[in-house]
Regions:
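Residue-level signal for inorganic ion chemistry
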Residues: 88, 238, 262
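Short, glycine/polar-rich helix-capping loops at beta-to-alpha or helix-loop-helix junctions
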Residues: 84, 105, 233-234, 253-258
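Single conserved hydrophobic/aromatic residue that forms the stacking wall/gate
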Residues: 1-7, 11, 271-281
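Short catalytic-loop micro-motif centered on adjacent basic/acidic residues
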Residues: 74-75, 95-97, 222-225, 245-248
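Long, structured protein-protein interaction/assembly regions in large complexes
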Residues: 5-184, 190-193, 203-207, 212-217
Length: 281
């Protein structure tokens, strides 16, 4: 089961972009067991957070980038109740996808005739489908990345070891960053995103965008990168805004320069290997 089996509770037509965003939001929220909220715009997350309840998770996710969240698609991994529904409609959203909705929540949503509501049912039965893309004269098939890398299996390559709080943030960030368009950089504070830099042609530019989005909340946060840093500049830039720990795959010919930069800034550096971009053809 996947997006194709999700049911719509409204008759408003779904656009091509709507369906892609619903699918992207669903893929991210399925990474988490605890109550989690995801906000997606144009296939990229602009806010993700986990908490003890969905309302707190949603408000934390919104705080990442409220401007970009305007008109976004939201996903949840628990039933949406009335209090959450009231908070959602306080600003414009394009659509919501969740396992279920309380009767009161649906009544609240009915006041927004342009709001698209999708219900998935039990998420435990959902699995990601392979990705199929057309090429000139052929097709490219890639299996979905459903590998869950344990943070305990990662290698600490810096002099300083991570704190428990940093490990929590690094694990959270690693789960989300693989869903950000590459070059992808994500700043996280334990169980919420703080800044996201997506889709840039150079990794340092993605770091700068994440920095811009996170100020003034970046101090004491951690950074996740979907691929290795080809130069030390990404670490140097992150250190300027208070990043304390970094997770990345490693594998650059300049890995030692990157490690040296982390040590100079007293940043904890973890290598995962493989990259979340690795896949099977």
């Amino acid at each position: 089961r996947g997006m194709s089996s999700a049911a719509s509770d409204v008759y408003k037509r779904q656009s091509y972009n709507n369906l892609l965003d619903f699918d992207a939001a669903l893929a991210i929220v399925m990474e988490f067991d605890e109550p989690t909220a995801v906000i997606v715009k144009h296939n990229n997350p602009c806010g993700v957070a986990s908490s003890t309840n969905l309302l707190d998770a949603f408000n934390s996710a919104m705080s990442t980038d409220p401007q970009s969240a305007f008109g976004g698609i939201i996903s949840f991994n628990r039933e949406v109740d009335a209090s959450l529904a009231e908070e959602i409609i306080s600003s414009f959203k394009e659509g919501i996808i969740a396992p279920s909705y309380s009767k009161e929540a649906l009544e609240i949503f009915s006041s927004k005739e342009n709001l698209r509501i999708m219900g998935t049912g039990n998420l435990e039965s959902y699995h990601r489908s392979p990705s199929l893309r057309s090429l000139d004269g052929g097709w490219l098939l890639q299996e979905a990345d459903e590998v869950c890398i344990s943070i305990s299996d990662c290698k600490v390559v810096s002099k300083r070891k991570p704190t428990n709080e940093e490990l929590e943030g690094l694990e959270f960030g690693w789960k989300v960053v693989k869903h950000v368009k590459s070059n992808a950089i994500l700043f996280a504070d334990r169980k919420r995103t703080v800044g996201i830099g997506a889709g840039q042609m150079s990794r340092i530019d993605s770091v700068k965008i994440a920095t811009f989005k996170s100020i003034p909340d970046s101090k004491g946060t951690v950074m996740a990168s979907d691929a290795f840093f080809p130069f030390r500049d990404g670490i140097d830039e992150a250190a300027k805004v208070g990043i304390t720990a970094v997770i990345q795959p490693g594998g650059s010919v300049r890995d030692q320069e990157v490690i040296d930069a982390a040590n100079e800034h007293n940043i904890c550096l973890l290598y995962t290997s493989p990259s979340p971009r690795d896949g099977l053809l």
